[in-house]
């Protein structure tokens, strides 16, 4: 039976992962995407529903064309009903929005669009059941999206929704980005996203994506390459407190040394410094917390995981810019986010986190450069909010204050720290 895939949002993860894999599978008759930027919609239509993705492999670049895409603007009165019909008939849907906060934004919001499509599904039993992949970078994205959709339905519809629709979390360790400078697109021989355009989407060649186990009766995924896990949380933590934490640490410290591209770290003493943080601080804490859950959380497998990720992080063909990696330091200094969250996890497991404290200190310095009259404590209060229940807050802030002193010498020598 021919399947339909619908994407909500059209950034690099949607275009370079979900739609790309759906197209490559050959299992979908229809590929549909929702995009609110009129110029993008018009450009894709002029390209007859096709776009290009540049894939950074270990040995070079390769381009892939995705064709047959239907693109609709939910803000357009003519497009919205076509999009709702596609949602109602879709077997697989992926949301790939900037953050979970976008679920309820816009008129209509993504949650409202999904609810309207699912309402039709509930009324017509011949329409297929649906899996919704929540690709936003939040460990509870699927639950938040489900709640946002349920809020748009009446009580009777809510009771029936779980029988027809399953929202699943995702662990997406795929690095991606948009190259906006036409000179860089030309210099690196990248294929523009749209044939007539000047921007290019560049993603790494990686599709080992983890998802929750599918529990809908008789459901067969069209995107077959994803791997199902009964308990996704340990792997979500491995990504956030391992992959994301080490990537941020490398980025913030590379910025202190005025490095432009992440692959330039490969020839410096910063790389082994980050490797030790990834192995000992992230790995030590995560392997203790999740011992026995999966082979990943053993010293041998974790070391292989670290080696693979560091190699991918410094892939020169990915052309990953340091300023992209360190964007939005306020979010990355969040209480549960990659830097502070990893430090807290290490404290919980009675381990040190001096290297991640240095990365957090570098992120703090970026913020204080624009807010010079603010103390570190006040800065974190503005990021974290009320501190009454945060028993580790003083210890965390103390480690970062100490790391700020060490950071002054970091530009000269990494190994002495």
Task: Label each region the model flagged.
Residues 1-417:
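Substrate/ligand-engaging "lid" and interaction regions
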């Amino acid at each position: 039976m021919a399947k339909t895939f619908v994407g909500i949002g059209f950034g690099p993860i949607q275009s370079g992962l979900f739609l790309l894999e759906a197209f490559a599978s050959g299992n979908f008759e229809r590929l549909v995407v929702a995009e609110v930027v009129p110029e993008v919609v018009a450009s894709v239509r002029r390209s007859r529903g096709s776009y290009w993705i540049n894939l950074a492999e270990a040995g070079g670049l390769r381009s892939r064309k995705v064709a047959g895409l239907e693109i609709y603007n939910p803000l357009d009165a003519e497009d919205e009903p076509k999009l709702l019909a596609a949602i109602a008939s879709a077997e697989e849907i992926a949301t790939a929005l900037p953050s979970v906060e976008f679920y309820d934004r816009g008129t209509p919001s993504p949650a409202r669009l999904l609810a309207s499509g699912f309402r039709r599904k509930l009324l017509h039993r011949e329409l297929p059941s649906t899996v919704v992949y929540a690709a936003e970078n939040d460990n509870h994205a699927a639950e938040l999206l489900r709640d946002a959709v349920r809020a748009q339905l009446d009580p009777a519809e809510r009771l029936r929704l779980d029988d027809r629709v399953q929202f699943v979390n995702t662990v997406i360790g795929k690095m991606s980005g948009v190259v906006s400078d036409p000179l860089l697109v030309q210099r690196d021989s990248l294929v523009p996203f749209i044939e007539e355009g000047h921007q290019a989407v560049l993603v790494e060649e990686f599709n080992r994506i983890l998802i929750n186990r599918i529990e809908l009766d008789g459901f067969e995924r069209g995107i077959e390459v994803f791997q199902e896990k009964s308990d996704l949380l340990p792997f979500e933590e491995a990504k956030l407190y391992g992959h994301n934490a080490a990537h941020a640490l490398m980025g913030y410290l590379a910025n202190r040394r005025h490095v432009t591209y992440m692959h330039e770290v490969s020839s410096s003493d910063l790389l082994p410094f980050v490797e030790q943080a990834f192995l000992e601080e992230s790995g030590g804490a995560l392997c203790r917390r999740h011992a026995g859950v999966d082979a990943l959380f053993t010293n041998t497998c974790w070391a292989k995981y670290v080696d693979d990720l560091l190699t991918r992080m410094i892939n020169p063909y990915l052309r990953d810019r340091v300023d992209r990696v360190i964007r939005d330091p306020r979010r990355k200094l969040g209480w549960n986010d990659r830097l502070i969250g990893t430090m807290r996890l290490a404290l919980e497991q009675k381990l040190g986190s001096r290297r991640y404290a240095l990365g957090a200190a570098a992120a703090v310095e970026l913020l204080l450069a624009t807010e010079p009259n603010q103390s570190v404590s006040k800065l974190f209060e503005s990021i974290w909010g009320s501190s009454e229940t945060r028993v580790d807050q003083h210890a965390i802030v103390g480690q970062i204050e100490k790391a700020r002193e060490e950071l002054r010498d970091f530009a000269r020598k990494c190994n002495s720290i």
